[in-house]
Amino acid sequence: MKNTMNTPVAIPVSKLHPFEGHPYKVLDNEEMNTLIESIQTQGILSPLIVRPMENTTDEYEVVSGHRRLHAAVKAGLETVPAFIYALDRDAAAIAVVDSNLHREHILPSEKAFAYKMKYDAIKHQGTSSQFETKQRSDVVLGADSGESRAQVQRYIRLTYLIPELLTMMDEEKIALSVGVELSFLPEQFQYDVLEACEMNDCTPSYSQSWHLHQYYKDGALDKYLIFKTLSEEKANQRETIKVPVNRLRDIIPEGFTVKQTEDFLVKAADYYTRYLHRQRDRER
């Protein structure tokens, strides 16, 4: 089956397969429901892009259009329009990533595995007519995605995280910088981190994850040290009391620094507490 004069052809959905290692999630959410309704009323307006699968007859791998294919199946379509291109694995991998990279909402885990896929493909291609010069793969990838080489490397590091920690990143429970530091820990230590988080009902800070990474590099990390580090109170978890400045303006001496003000209030509270105790003693 071939497309003639660059026109799409109708391909049975049973002959289409997701791209191996496809890094983007296809979710049954509100956006998917909207897409299904659109396909039911208008059909597929933008044809898929597919490539012939090796060692098969009339079987195709989806390069662009995984969500459209999923929605089409949900909508009950038996065939979908698609352009067929004879792409090799590397060119197809790059196209898979590029076709989704500028979506409005991309999860950190999706971006991590997308960057890794494209990085490996560019590296495997070597000198390519597409890029013309022998640049570092992460430099090329960074230029294509609008991110620095260092940021590309950080995202690729996330592919070394266990699935549970990646999910925490996707749910914005831990920051990118935290995930990068934890990615250097062996899998078992990462599961120890996860267990410590669950037991202490906490998430690691950058400082804590950085220290865990350093302990591991020094050969000192063990489960006890992981639990000890993550059980320590973080600065952003300490209880604080906020008092509007206008309530203190007539109390605090003029020209006091923040530190002097804090010390003054602590001493004033201590003095007032002792005063109340003396008053109670007199009333007895």
Can you describe what each PLM-predicted range is?
Residues 42-46, 125, 130, 190:
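Glutamine-centric residue-chemistry signal
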